[in-house]
Curated annotation (Swiss-Prot):
Gene3D superfamilies: Spore Coat Polysaccharide Biosynthesis Protein SpsA, Chain A (3.90.550.10)
Binding positions (phosphoenolpyruvate): T151, G166, S169
Pathway of action: Cofactor biosynthesis; coenzyme F420 biosynthesis
Designated name of the protein: Phosphoenolpyruvate guanylyltransferase
InterPro entries from the UniProt entry: CofC, Nucleotide-diphossugar_trans
The gene coding this protein: fbiD
Entry keyword set: GTP-binding, Nucleotide-binding, Nucleotidyltransferase, Transferase
UniProt keyword annotation of ATP-binding present: no
Superkingdom of the organism of origin: Bacteria
E.C. numbers: 2.7.7.105
An annotated Gene Ontology molecular function: GTP binding
Similarity comment text for this entry: Belongs to the CofC family.
Pfam family, one: CofC
Length: 218
């Protein structure tokens, strides 16, 4: 299995902040319910976040925006900054609102922002480093997920992030002017929504915390 951090990724995150939005663990990844009991699902979601933050933190400063105390504690333990999610209950677009709040918080000191999904357990720091380097050549860009419909990462260099995560987000980001990056970064594209996604990521190789949480051999 691959580890949570890279095999010596060259730092490329100067002037870049990574922001990750995480909902309450009890409400996250409900499509994994067929294979995990509620408490076990929360454990897996938290493990995926830890592996994602660990990989990202090897490249750039990370801010996690969340209302969940356990997610906040885990992020702080990895050296990430934590922002209490200001999104009110019942907000029609909670994920993008949380990302905009995190963007506003980091823009005071960092000109460039990457919005990263928090469920990328196979992510390698080298992949994120290479994607950031590619993104520097244009103001706004994104990396699609392995299905081609979602977005794993959105990059904004000197311009507003304008996140449009949600159903068909790849097309929504494309229509908003973001350029799709086509590099070979499999771990950056394997976000987890369904049991099939998790199986595919495990075949690719997940980080140590996710491997432990799902009972995979390490």
């Amino acid at each position: 299995m691959r580890g949570t951090t890279s095999n010596g990724a060259a730092p490329s995150g100067a002037g870049v902040a990574v922001v990750i939005a995480v909902k309450r663990l009890a409400d996250a990844k409900t499509r994994l319910a067929p294979i995990f009991a509620p408490h076990d699902r929360e454990t897996v979601v938290l493990a995926m976040l830890v592996d994602t933050v660990a990989a990202a933190a090897a490249v750039a400063a990370v801010t996690v925006v969340t209302p969940d105390p356990a997610a906040a504690e885990a992020a702080r333990a990895l050296g990430a900054q934590v922002l209490d999610d200001p999104t009110p209950a019942g907000h029609p677009d909670p994920l993008n609102n949380a990302l905009r709040a995190a963007e506003a918080a980091v823009r005071a000191t960092v000109p460039n922002v990457v919005a990263l999904q928090g469920d990328l357990p196979a992510l390698q720091a080298q992949e994120l480093s290479e994607a950031i380097a590619a993104a520097r050549t244009r103001p706004r860009s994104f990396v699609g997920d392995r299905h081609g419909t979602g977005t794993s990462a959105l990059f904004a260099f000197g311009v507003p992030l304008d996140p449009r995560f949600g159903p068909d987000s790849a097309e929504r980001h494309r229509r908003s002017g973001a350029v799709e990056l086509t590099g070979s970064w499999p771990g950056l594209r394997y976000d987890i929504d369904t049991p099939d996604d998790l199986l595919a990521a495990r075949r690719l190789g997940v980080g140590t915390q996710t491997a432990r949480a799902v009972g995979a051999e390490r």
